[in-house]
């Protein structure tokens, strides 16, 4: 799954940009999911949410007291991935998320500074403004191609097995071009688990327990031989 977040101050055009991106990807025959963060409680009549729902295959909303797709309480975005099966995930808001890259929307009020935008995670900006060396995309086509080329999603486990203190550190290096998503050992190890097409990360300790248990059970089966095994399970 390719993923990108749209981050900027209020009235900076995040929703409008998200809608245009979704339309662009749909025209390419891709499935698209959208996740919208909100500082207030959610309801299906929310204008932005319904706009996304008219275009996207799946929509999630994450508010302070509830999570859209009617789960009570706040949930961690990676927990929703099995329900957001798509080729591309568009996240609006979530400025503190460090496990995916972002596009900066800078047309709004920046009087509070730029540190909260975490430009170190930015693949680019959209519009007429940018920050420092961050490339600016002036068309939806240019922006969409950038997302398809460089978008990614880490598990957000902060397990440190990649040699960095958290997923944000790896995400920064991926954005810089000095690492790739394959450096995430929680997602790329000897066992791969996905639910409804969405990969599930696991710490090495958990991976060792699961893989060792499965190997021992498979060895007892008639017809077993060493090699690469494929196991499909309804959960």
Model-based region annotation:
Residues 156-172, 186:
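Local cysteine-cluster metal-coordination motifs and their immediate loop/turn environment
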Residues 145-158:
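Immediate flanking context of iron-sulfur cluster ligation sites
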Residues 67-110:
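Glycine-rich phosphate-binding loop used to anchor ATP phosphates in small-molecule kinases
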Residues 6:
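Hydrophobic anchor at the beta1->P-loop junction of P-loop NTPases
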Residues 20-72:
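N-terminal phosphate/diphosphate-binding loop that engages ATP/GTP or pyrophosphate donors
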Residues 14:
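Conserved lysine of the Walker
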Residues 34-35, 88-91, 100-107, 111-131:
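Conserved beta-strand/loop subsegment of P-loop NTPase cores
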Residues 10:
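The conserved Walker
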